[in-house]
Amino acid sequence: MGQKTHPYGFRLGITKDWKSHWYAERSDYSSLLHEDWAIRNYLKKNYYQAGISLIEIERKAANRVDITIHTARPGMLIGRGGSEIENIRKNLIKLTNKNVFVNVQEVKNPELDAQLVAENIAMQIEKRINYKRAMKQAINRALRAGAKGIKVMCSGRLNGAEIARSEWFREGRIPLQTLTADIDYGFAEAFTISGVIGVKVWIYKGDVPELHKEAIQELPEKAVPKKIEDEDLYEKDEVNYDVDA
């Protein structure tokens, strides 16, 4: 059975960047890793309705944490006069015992963000909307927004079935094995009466232009046949080709 590797981890360092930027000695690594998890868990759990797509964490000093939150609804995080963002900062300072600086960035096209699309489908399933309808609506919105391909898969006890199964819909291209392809991936869970339903979304936005040009330049030249005189064709049965190694 063929299994699909994680599209994000597969492209780390090529088209995708790390979600955390810091270096630590071996003795401190595990504690900082748990701290990153606690920060992300606090934000996703308490501000799930804000449509948080990505949380970037950067540590430039031992006692400083810079957090960038990418969200579709920045107003819910900032609050009136910046009151809510200040409340978030104070809670994160208590959580980490470090100086915390929070920056909020708006996601311009939520329909093209795989994580937000997956969470939106999961929320609709929790509200007892038919999963097929939710999946097809998400696909249509993404294609109208400019996606070149999208695949959505739901797994679990769909419609309360006794046996769990997986169903998926796909439109356009999803070149998972092409490293220069800009593929966004998102995963969310819908908690229903029947059990947990997993939602996975792949969105293909096109190739990364710079990497695509480099890949074309690195390709070997095509085999070019030798120029053969007419009289040579009668003397030789085979035609030789020079192929650049």
From Swiss-Prot:
<keyword id="KW-0699">rRNA-binding</keyword>
<protein>
    <recommendedName>
        <fullName>Small ribosomal subunit protein uS3</fullName>
    </recommendedName>
</protein>
<dbReference type="InterPro" id="IPR004087">
    <property type="entry name" value="KH_dom"/>
</dbReference>
<keyword id="KW-0689">Ribosomal protein</keyword>
<dbReference type="InterPro" id="IPR005704">
    <property type="entry name" value="Ribosomal_uS3_bac-typ"/>
</dbReference>
<dbReference type="InterPro" id="IPR036419">
    <property type="entry name" value="Ribosomal_S3_C_sf"/>
</dbReference>
<dbReference type="InterPro" id="IPR018280">
    <property type="entry name" value="Ribosomal_uS3_CS"/>
</dbReference>
<dbReference type="GO" id="GO:0022627">
    <property type="term" value="C:cytosolic small ribosomal subunit"/>
</dbReference>
<keyword id="KW-0694">RNA-binding</keyword>
<feature type="domain" description="KH type-2">
    <location>
        <begin position="39"/>
        <end position="108"/>
    </location>
</feature>
<dbReference type="GO" id="GO:0019843">
    <property type="term" value="F:rRNA binding"/>
</dbReference>
<dbReference type="InterPro" id="IPR001351">
    <property type="entry name" value="Ribosomal_uS3_C"/>
</dbReference>
<dbReference type="InterPro" id="IPR004044">
    <property type="entry name" value="KH_dom_type_2"/>
</dbReference>
<dbReference type="GO" id="GO:0006412">
    <property type="term" value="P:translation"/>
</dbReference>
<keyword id="KW-0687">Ribonucleoprotein</keyword>
<comment type="subunit">
    <text>Part of the 30S ribosomal subunit. Forms a tight complex with proteins S10 and S14.</text>
</comment>
<dbReference type="GO" id="GO:0003729">
    <property type="term" value="F:mRNA binding"/>
</dbReference>
<dbReference type="GO" id="GO:0003735">
    <property type="term" value="F:structural constituent of ribosome"/>
</dbReference>
<dbReference type="InterPro" id="IPR015946">
    <property type="entry name" value="KH_dom-like_a/b"/>
</dbReference>
<dbReference type="InterPro" id="IPR009019">
    <property type="entry name" value="KH_sf_prok-type"/>
</dbReference>
<comment type="function">
    <text>Binds the lower part of the 30S subunit head. Binds mRNA in the 70S ribosome, positioning it for translation.</text>
</comment>
<dbReference type="Pfam" id="PF07650">
    <property type="entry name" value="KH_2"/>
</dbReference>
<comment type="similarity">
    <text>Belongs to the universal ribosomal protein uS3 family.</text>
</comment>
<dbReference type="Pfam" id="PF00189">
    <property type="entry name" value="Ribosomal_S3_C"/>
</dbReference>
